[in-house]
Amino acid sequence: RLRYIDGHPSILETLYFPRKYDFLLHENLEGSVFSILHAHGITVHNSRRTLEISNASSNEAGLLEIKRNSPLLLFRDYQSDSQGNPLFVCKQLYNTQNMIFYL
């Protein structure tokens, strides 16, 4: 998914799900993925997030409307259920030119 902030492409998000969640192919994914999973009785129990600095590839730069090799914040989220089974992995690339993060 390509997410916009104030009309500017700002976050490139890629979600990876196990095959058993193929029902998502028939869902409207413009809203919250967590809401869709919850509607199917699936809840996230454990979550782990990593943060790295990355440089935009040609494809990523084109989608985010920035120069190739521009710095990006790369977040990876690992979500699992109460038994530790993987639900999904999320990769988010943030265009830092449009954002300020408050911690």
Protein language model features and the residues they cover:
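C-terminal all-alpha effector/ligand-binding and dimerization domain
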Residues: 1-103
